[in-house]
Amino acid sequence: MKNYDVLVIGGGPGGYVAAIKAAQMGAKVALVEKHKLGGICLNYGCIPTKAYLKSAKMYKDIKRCADFGIKVKNGVSFDWSSILSRKNKIVAQLTTGISFLLKKNKIDFYHGFASVLSPCEVQVDTNLLHTQKLIIATGSNAFVPPIPGAQEAYQKGILKTSKELLQLESYPSKVTIVGGGVIGVEFATIFNSFGSEVTILERQDTILNGMDRDVVVAYTKKLQTDGIQILNQVEVTKINDNQTTYTQKGNAKTITSDVILMAVGTKANLAGLEKLNLALNRNSVQTDNFCQTSIPGVYAIGDVNGKHMLAHVASHEGIVAVTHALEQKAHPINYDRVPACIYGFPEIASIGMTEQQAKEKQMDYKASKISLGAVGKSLADGEKEGFAKLIVCKKHLEILGMHIYAYNATELISEMAVGMELEGTAYELSQAIHPHPTLSELTFEALLGAVNKPIHA
């Protein structure tokens, strides 16, 4: 039996970060992973989709290069196999990097399935491991709901989750996407950009349910303008090979496509944890703001705790959990200050309250909304569509939320995340000099608008 101070199950963005942080703090650490280092995010999620989106953006930009005075002879085309190959190379480089970091930090790595026998004992194949603290980072799996015919279509390879779709070797001409959340709209953007006929079937009233209404309205209009068909308030009733039957307002219809993407969410991966008898919350491991479970010395981070299924949240939870486990001063996680990003053309970045939530809580708030056209850099870049919307407490100008719909929006939201974490006000952040010409002036103008009035709007 080998003894460890910290044992981490799962090598995704939560698990490997937790393992490295624990080793940096002087602990003897083991990391167990049954599949690939990097988890869903690196292998089948965040990074692969961004690689595809970069190729899509390049393709779209070249097609409009005449707007910038550039001429392309004989048109432009794409090679799907080369796009796939580029994605695979990026993923391989990053997974190799994680492996290097584990060795650098002297972390023992076990490749296999972890069966937890007790809070301090874990079996991995023939290895029995003992640990003082246990970090569960087993992630989640894509969910295929019990729709008649869905499992059969999945087994035949016609219906796919995001994991399989990212390995697609041939380009589909028609794609049906069940689910209008983040995964659904990002894949819709990818395939639409290369010319696929894309339809999104969403059960709720809108896509991206829960995001600020102004953002959802603008983004929906943009997707539709690009040629993506969006059907809301839809119930998928049957899948028969490549045919998806749905009802909308009582009317039944069937749509045929080359590929069906099931993007209705994920389920926490609890396999191997049964003997712990952990307290659950909606089929995810229940945790507090230090990621502690119902069992002392056992922590759960990332998708498995169901709080926010985002890679950056998992990584942060890993650091907090390990710091707390090793009895160092840990800062509890405030889950109301989590930035969320959606990648497309344009992008969406959001943190904190939406205007609708502020209204529902009957808060005395002020909304400052600035058009992207007020920023000179955006015009030079040939990007005109978008806005930033800042929500503040009217009395003290405390930042309640920020919602950005613009190109490179995801690179702007961190300023607000820092401001909110430090409990700064719109006035205090507006005193920082923002460089010109940069896209950061969009958030600066929104701050000025919250304090008094913007300069360029």
Where are these regions (language model features)?
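Beta1/beta-strand and adjacent pyrophosphate-binding region of the FAD-binding site
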Residues: 1-12, 171-178
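N-terminal Rossmann-like dinucleotide/flavin-binding domain of flavoprotein oxidoreductases
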Residues: 2, 43-44, 48-128, 210-234, ...
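Short hydrophobic core segments
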Residues: 7-9, 114, 129-139, 178, ...
